[in-house]
Structures are given as structure tokens and as C-alpha cells.
Amino acid sequence: MNPTRPCGPLSSVAVRRSGATLLRGAVTALALLMPLAGGSALAQAGVAAEGSESAPLAAVQVQRIEGLYAGLGMDRLLGIMREEGLSYGDELENEMFPGRGGERWETVVDQIYDTDRMGQIVRRQLAETLAETDLAPLEEFFGSDLGQRIVGLEIAARDALLDPGTEEAARDKLAMMQDDAHSRLDVLGRFAEANELVETNVVGALNSNFAFYQGLADGGAFEVEMDEDEMIREVWQREPDIRIETEIWVFSYLNLAYQPLTDEEIDSYTTLSLTSEGQALNRALFAAFDELFLTISGELGLAAAQFVGGQDI
């Protein structure tokens, strides 16, 4: 269950300042499996479990979560997320304070998208939310030849979409398939629906955009102060555009990633997603990414505000 395009604050949203419209152009995607980097979260989980009768079982569960995600190639995905974030940082500078960021802004963005820190945030959430989940069906599927093949395809597609030309080609391919009412879209649609990929990512995008607004406001980016209700209205009015863009990215990605798979192989992945264990994994991932993106979005907004106002950080 890999697809998500977490570049920072997600989706396109307009930030109005002094009558100008400053566009933010990142795109949301799906449920990404984060790499489990660093050891502090596991250590904390172990410490929390000490002193209770269930401590040995809790430690085993944490180790199994570690093994599951190590097998999913999460370190590579986290590296791709960092590349996406650095690129998004360049977009923010060009749109909000062109020519005023320079090395200082690059340093800030580099620190925000630190892979060790990102991994710790997600890892902590996953250790908590999957603590009571039976991991055996997940370990069996992702440890199989098909599971490992799917993981490789998902990572390769994410990496390929770092290239704008590849992403444009994937979108064009999707449009042609939609025009032809290609039967493959039904297969991909069942997978997307089973994992609530569009709806959950739309909600996550709105939350991330709101956090970005809050960061801007806290940093003094708005000449006229915006209250929380105004921020919510600004964010919510972009919901239709966010939903359309999310649907396009989701299905472009799925079609690219799973192109070598048969319909039956994708359906078997969908079947796993519909199990209680698959649903638990999906919920855990979205909860983890929600915390991660809220953190990143708020920090980017706060940092950007200093540059918009011409201040050093």
C-alpha cells in the first residue's frame, strides 16, 4: 500500500496577501508506507511497555512492525519523499518570495525534510496504532513473491514520477484510458475504493493546508490578521480542485505502478486491503502521515512567513 505524494502542504491552495494571490502547487496522493528509520521510537515503545505483564509481547510486536516495514523498502521511499519535499521548497520560494530565499531557505527546507526525524514521527505513530493488530496476514502477503514485486513496482513508480515528463505522460495515459473506458480502470477503482485513497487524501490535504495557513499566520505573513474561521473557509473553498487533482494523481500513479501486474494480481492486493488487518494498516498509515504532514506543513508555513516578510530566520 504505497501510493502517496507527500511533498509538504498538499494540494494547490491560494494564500492571499495584500491583494496578491500566492499559489501553492503541490499535489496529494495516496497512502504511502513510510520507511522506519532511526531507533528512538522503538526504544521509547519498549520503555513504555516495561513494568507491565505484556512487555515481552509488546516488544515482539514492535520488532515485527520493524521487520514488516524493512521488507517494504521504506528507506528508499523516505528518500524519495525528501526529494519531493526539496523540490516543493523550490516551488514555494518561486511563488511566495522569489529571489529572497537563497541558501538560508534551502537550509530550512533541508532541516524540515530530515529523513531521520520524519521516520521517527511516522514510526512512533505506527508502533502505537498497530500495537494490537495481527500482523501475520500482512507479513505473509508482503513476504511473498507477489508482495515483494508489488513493493518494487510501487517504489519504482514513485521514483519515476520525480521527473515531470514522466508524470505528464502518466496523466496522458490515464486520460486516454478514460476516453476508451478501459476495463483496467475498474480494477484500479476497486483497489482505490478499498483503501479510501481519494477521500482520505483529500481530508489530509485540507488538514495540511490549514496547518500551512496557521504557520503563515503565526509567522506574521498576513498584513490583515486571519482568524481560524477565515482560514477554514479559505482552505475549504479549494476542496473541489483538491479532489479533482487527487483523483488524477491517484489513478495516474496506480496505473503506472501496477502496469506489469495482471488484473488478478491487483485483485488479490485489494482482497488483502479489505481484511481487518489490511484496513488497520491503512488507517495506521494515514494517521501517521497526517501527523507528519501537519508537522511539516506548519513548519513550512512558519518559515515561509519570515521570508515573505523579508525577515531572516
Task: Cite the ranges covered by each PLM segment.
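Bacterial N-terminal signal peptides
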Residues: G25-A37
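Second-shell loop/turn segments in exported
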Residues: S54-A55, G71-D75, E106-Y113, V122-L126, ...
